[in-house]
Regions:
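N-terminal secretory signal peptides and thylakoid transit peptides that target proteins
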Residues: 1-22
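N-terminal "arm"/small-domain region of PLP-dependent enzymes with the aminotransferase-like
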Residues: 24-75, 169
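Phosphate-binding glycine-rich loop
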Residues: 82-122, 140
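PLP-dependent aminotransferase-like
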Residues: 115-175
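Conserved PLP-binding catalytic core of the aspartate aminotransferase-like
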Residues: 149-151, 298-299, 309-342, 361
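Active-site phosphate-binding strand-loop segment of PLP-dependent enzymes
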Residues: 151-217
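PLP-dependent aminotransferase class I/II
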Residues: 232-317
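PLP-dependent enzyme catalytic core of the Aspartate aminotransferase-like
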Residues: 338-341, 350-383
Length: 383
């Protein structure tokens, strides 16, 4: 199947309606250039709008660093791990003993929750969120308390507080902020004040995988409490999202030294990171312009998609990440199957939001192509 460049460009331009004339002209030029290089997806090489990855790939500097790392592959990475730990600490504004390096944030989630496993512990999490936290609890035989969502799939902090205060044992509270799959943030003041109140026998695991994408000025990272010395909070970050290193498997936990020491007992060796991953991460840190460019491209793609959804009358939640959560008002599976037939993969089901679809943002050209398919689906009565 082919798509005319003119058609793709027109879709992007229409979707960007509502921007200022100057902004629209600038975006039009970028969209036209991107459309010129765009290759439509195929069954063998589908458009992956399902995993919330950075569609730009690693920065050129990181790719070169990975290739050069082959020369170091025969040696253990002890020294370079410490260089990376120092770089991560500097990035977070902390010290090296605040950092626990992990194989992706998945290991950090698991280790953080397992380190607080007791006979009377419960893991408290919103009903609609990334499932690694509750999955870890289930695998460890820990009680899981899933708290119903508030209006518009918001996280009901008051209800979560009640779940903790009414429990006689210990609690691990798992937050994803910005939340996945909703792409929304919680009220920072409300969350941080709760953590700072130090509820008895309670630790907070705050997964900030998408923090680098947030544009809302009211957002505050829970790292501020770590910096203030609070021992009851662990902040998790990953290199899988804006850093475009999902396949490299690198993440970290950020907490006060005593908390880091506790969690560290539940990872194999935080000095045994992959050499290519270490070198890629260091290269990314040395190239802040790439992160800025990634944010800009993500924002442009988001504008293309949300403008189209507005035009189509499809509701969606305000996005603070690299994906959008939209309401199909119909079961997800038929839509996902039809998109897959077009070589486009969208997000999996997220109960209980069974009529909602999480769409990862591709490049502006990829997103414009998805938008074109949305309009075609509307013509067929499918959305």
């Amino acid at each position: 199947m082919t798509i005319q460049r003119r058609t793709l460009f027109a879709t992007a331009a229409i979707s960007a309606a509502g921007m200022t004339l100057t902004g629209c002209a600038a975006q039009a030029a970028k969209a036209e250039a991107a459309a010129a290089a765009f290759v439509p997806p195929t069954a063998e090489k589908p458009l992956l709008l399902c995993f919330n990855e950075n569609p730009l790939g690693m920065s050129p500097a990181a790719k070169k660093a990975v290739a050069a790392a082959a020369e170091k592959g025969s040696r253990y990475p002890f020294a370079r791990v410490e260089v990376l730990r120092k770089a991560v600490a500097q990035y977070m504004g902390g010290k090296t003993d605040n950092i626990l390096l992990t194989h992706g944030s998945a290991e950090a989630i698991r280790a953080s929750i397992e380190s607080y496993k007791t006979a009377d512990v419960q893991v408290v999490a919103p009903e609609l969120t990334y499932s690694d936290g509750t999955d870890t609890a289930d695998k460890n035989g820990m009680k899981v308390t899933r708290v119903a969502m508030g209006k518009d799939w918001s996280i009901d902090i008051a209800a979560m507080k009640k779940a903790v205060s009414s429990w006689k044992g210990s609690s691990v509270v798992y937050f994803v902020n910005p939340n996945n799959p909703t792409s929304t943030i919680v009220n920072s003041t409300e969350l941080l004040d709760w953590i700072a109140s130090r509820p008895a026998r309670t630790v907070f695991v705050v997964d900030e995988a998408y923090a680098e994408f947030v544009a809302d000025p009211t957002f505050k990272s829970a790292k501020t409490l770590v910096d203030a010395g609070f021992e009851n909070v662990i902040v998790l970050r990953t290199f899988s999202k804006i850093f475009a290193m999902a396949g490299m498997r690198l993440g970290f936990a950020y907490a006060v030294p005593a908390t880091i020491a506790r969690v560290k007992k539940h990872v194999a060796y935080d000095i045994m990171m992959s050499v290519p991953a270490i070198e890629a991460a260091l290269a990314e840190f040395a190239d802040p312009a790439f992160l800025t460019y990634s944010r800009e491209q993500n924002a442009e793609a988001r504008t293309i998609l949300t403008a189209a959804l507005d035009k189509l009358g499809i509701a969606y939640l305000p996005s603070q990440t690299n994906f959008v959560f939209m309401n199909l008002k119909a079961p997800l599976k038929p839509f996902a199957d039809r998109m897959k037939a077009e070589a486009i993969w969208v997000g999996r089901p997220f109960p209980p939001a069974l009529t909602w679809c999480r769409v990862s943002l591709g490049t502006p050209a990829e997103t414009a192509y998805f938008v074109k398919k949305l309009f075609e689906f509307r013509e067929k009565g499918w959305v």
